[in-house]
């Protein structure tokens, strides 16, 4: 406002109407009454757990595929420590430009997780060492251990998923509550069961509805490898 008491600018908020595609994920198994009656309840629970587990794998795979599809390249990593620094910060710059948001997560496939854990400095010390009680890591850009996927390379929360294609590395912002680049929605509908008297059987199924949305595609950056 200038001068004082002059009219201030009026801004109208515009809320976008985005269409989000919904995907139905489901699986089923058919059992005879003999299988049901002659099998222990514990064994039946294994069947139900398997249905739920397969649904969870399919849901995760859909999210992983859609996240990678939405990503835009921020460069190529040659496998060295120095180039990793450049690639990650190039991605962070691409995310921050014109938005003032910073990345929060690094999503990688298991092979890339292995590459990160094996990176060493010129003296052979791990760049991402395991830091135990009372020990201080040297040259620690983050920390990692071969017994866990947890880590924070360059301050980013590491997420490792075997449903990603090999050589996948994605830098983005999620879970912050504001400025999230990628969103995931899920409605688990659960187990359904239907008797089929004509064949003395029972059909059991498990299903749910899943959606993903690339809210800010420019903030989903991938780093490829040669």
Predicted segment positions?
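Short, contiguous, pocket-lining structural segments
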Residues: 17-21, 39-47, 64, 80
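Protruding loop/beta-arch "assembly-hinge" segments enriched in small, turn-prone residues
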Residues: 13, 60, 68, 187-226
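Extended, low-charge hydrophobic alpha-helical regions
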Residues: 19-38, 116, 120-124
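Short helix/loop capping segments that flank catalytic or ligand/cofactor-binding pockets
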Residues: 1-2, 8-11, 39-40, 115-118, ...
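Assembly/oligomerization interface modules of large self-assembling protein complexes
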Residues: 1-25
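Long amphipathic alpha-helical segments
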Residues: 43, 47-67
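Extended oligomerization regions of viral-like shell subunits
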Residues: 75-208
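Short, highly charged C-terminal tails/helix-capping segments
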Residues: 67-76
């Amino acid at each position: 406002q200038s001068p004082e008491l002059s009219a201030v600018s009026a801004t109208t908020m515009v809320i976008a109407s985005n269409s989000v595609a919904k995907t139905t994920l489901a699986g089923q198994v058919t059992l005879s009454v003999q299988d049901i009656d002659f099998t222990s309840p514990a064994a039946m629970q294994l069947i139900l757990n398997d249905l739920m587990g397969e649904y969870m794998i399919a849901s995760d795979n859909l999210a992983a595929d859609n996240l990678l599809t939405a990503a835009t390249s921020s460069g190529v990593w040659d496998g060295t420590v120095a180039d990793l620094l450049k690639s990650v910060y190039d991605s962070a710059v691409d995310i921050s430009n014109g938005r003032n948001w910073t990345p929060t997560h690094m999503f990688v496939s298991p092979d890339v997780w292995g590459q990160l854990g094996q990176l060493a400095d010129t003296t052979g010390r791990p760049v991402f060492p395991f830091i135990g009680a009372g020990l201080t890591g040297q040259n620690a850009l983050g920390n990692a251990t071969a017994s866990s996927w947890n880590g924070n390379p360059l301050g980013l929360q590491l997420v490792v998923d075997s449903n990603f294609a090999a050589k996948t590395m994605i830098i983005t912002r999620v879970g912050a509550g504001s400025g999230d680049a990628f969103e995931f929605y899920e409605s688990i509908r659960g187990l359904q069961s239907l008797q089929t008297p004509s064949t003395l059987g029972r059909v059991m199924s498990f299903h749910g509805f899943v959606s993903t949305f690339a809210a800010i595609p420019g903030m989903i950056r991938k780093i490829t490898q040669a």
